[in-house]
């Protein structure tokens, strides 16, 4: 129905109105499956209303769950626990951002005043490690998105958030945040 209905309607309307297709390519998943592996259907009564999921867990959690769950061309086995876990991952990211911005605000940190070159001599091993991991993630994520392997890109991002950023880096630098304002190693962590 999506292929015949929405995609074709958009294609026909775009060509008639503007003389060109409104999209270059279309990427779509297979069926949305219920907990028993059956395709969701209103007539079967096994549909999960997206609005209810968004209201309870947020749109970003639902999007992130759908992104990382299955290859775009495969069926998606919908599990509410998966959406909950996606929300937890995003909350971890939010907490990391909150941790960093709280200390940066206390110290009136301005990234325009502390350049990478100024911070580089004061990087600790964990700072250099996170910079390396971030660069690796950026390259891997870009390659996977370009290859339309969105599920792999989403999973790599999740692993980076939970393992590299939260479980390792934040724990390793936590004590440095108690250093005096202007401490070079603390500023290097901020810059990281």
Predicted segments, located by residue:
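Long, charged, mostly alpha-helical binding arms that flank functional sites
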Residues: 20-192
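Short, conserved micro-motifs enriched in small and acidic residues
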Residues: 1-7, 156, 191
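Metal-dependent nuclease catalytic cores in nucleic-acid-processing enzymes
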Residues: 3-19
